[in-house]
Amino acid sequence: MADAGLDPAPPVLGEDATAVACLFRGLADPTRLMIVRHLARGEHRVVDLVAHLGLAQSTVSGHLACMRDCGLVTSRAQGRASVYSLARPELLDLLLAAQAYLDAVGERR
């Protein structure tokens, strides 16, 4: 029996659960969150992200591939380089909501 005072489950938890899980998998790594932070400032080549993050090119490329597969970033060719950008600006709203949630519950890990 459903509680009369509770709102029904948001539709995001229904048929789109797989897509939502993929979205959060794409964000579930501190390095990927740092990549989002850099891409929020504008497009970056892989070599630029490597320099900013201090990681191997293969590591950064692997994270970008995961993020691309999850629909978080897009890429375009620029000569022999790939230039990455955030797929949608709403991603930043999601991260702000996550920060607000963490602030509300006082969780820091």
Task: Please place each PLM-identified region on the residue numbering.
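Residues within the DNA-recognition helix of helix-turn-helix
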Residues: 63
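Short hinge/loop at the helix->beta-strand junction immediately C-terminal to the helix-turn-helix recognition helix
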Residues: 66, 71-72
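Amphipathic alpha-helical dimerization/coiled-coil segments
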Residues: 1-19, 88-109
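Low-complexity, flexible helical/coil segments
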Residues: 72-75, 109
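N-terminal helix-turn-helix DNA-binding core of bacterial DNA-binding proteins
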Residues: 14-59, 71, 78, 82-91
